[in-house]
């Protein structure tokens, strides 16, 4: 089995359905004998260019270990799901379990927003 990193761009109006979509894809992977090493929800982010007249998309990153049959099934599911704007699958040499640089950026942004909210609340008193 090979290691893969999958990046999904989901339609921003479908952000509420992302957990259900993710569970369906996880089920496909584990049913085929694959393993999930890392799942990251990067949230709604600005796109570099417009896709289907949309400026934002919901990003997901999944690192898995699976065989070719499972990957073909996943690619087929991505292709025929209208909520998936784009998908990218990259073969990796080894499993990656640590936080990605993008996830670290997302966590930093969330921490900055939280500290700004605390600062604003403290200054109102």
Curated annotation (Swiss-Prot):
Highest rank taxon of the organism: Bacteria
Gene Ontology biological-process entries: translation
Entry keywords, A to Z: Ribonucleoprotein, Ribosomal protein, RNA-binding, rRNA-binding
CC annotations in GO: cytosolic small ribosomal subunit
Composition bias type Basic and acidic residues, residue spans: 105-115
Gene3D superfamilies assigned to the protein according to its UniProt record, in alphabetical order: 3.30.70.60
UniProt-listed Pfam families: Ribosomal_S6 (PF01250)
Region described as Disordered: 96-125
Family matches, as SUPFAM superfamilies: Ribosomal protein S6 (SSF54995)
Organism, scientific name: Paracidovorax citrulli (strain AAC00-1) (Acidovorax citrulli)
Job of this protein: Binds together with bS18 to 16S ribosomal RNA.
PANTHER family for this protein: MITOCHONDRIAL 28S RIBOSOMAL PROTEIN S6 (PTHR21011), SMALL RIBOSOMAL SUBUNIT PROTEIN BS6M (PTHR21011:SF1)
Recorded family membership: Belongs to the bacterial ribosomal protein bS6 family.
Protein name (Swiss-Prot/TrEMBL): Small ribosomal subunit protein bS6
Coiled-coil features, chain-numbered ranges: none
Molecular function per GO: small ribosomal subunit rRNA binding; structural constituent of ribosome
Keyword Transcription regulation applies: no
């Amino acid at each position: 089995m090979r290691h893969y990193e999958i990046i999904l761009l989901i339609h921003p109006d479908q952000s509420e359905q992302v957990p259900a979509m993710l569970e369906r894809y996880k089920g496909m992977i584990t049913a085929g004998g694959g393993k999930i090493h890392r799942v990251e929800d990067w949230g709604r982010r600005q796109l570099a260019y417009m896709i289907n007249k949309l400026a934002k998309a919901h990003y997901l990153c999944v690192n898995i270990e699976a065989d070719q049959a499972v990957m073909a099934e996943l690619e087929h599911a991505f292709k025929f799901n209208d909520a998936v704007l784009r998908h990218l699958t990259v073969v990796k040499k080894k499993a990656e379990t640590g936080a990605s640089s993008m996830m670290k950026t997302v966590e930093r942004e969330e921490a900055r927003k939280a500290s700004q909210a605390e600062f604003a609340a403290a200054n109102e008193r």
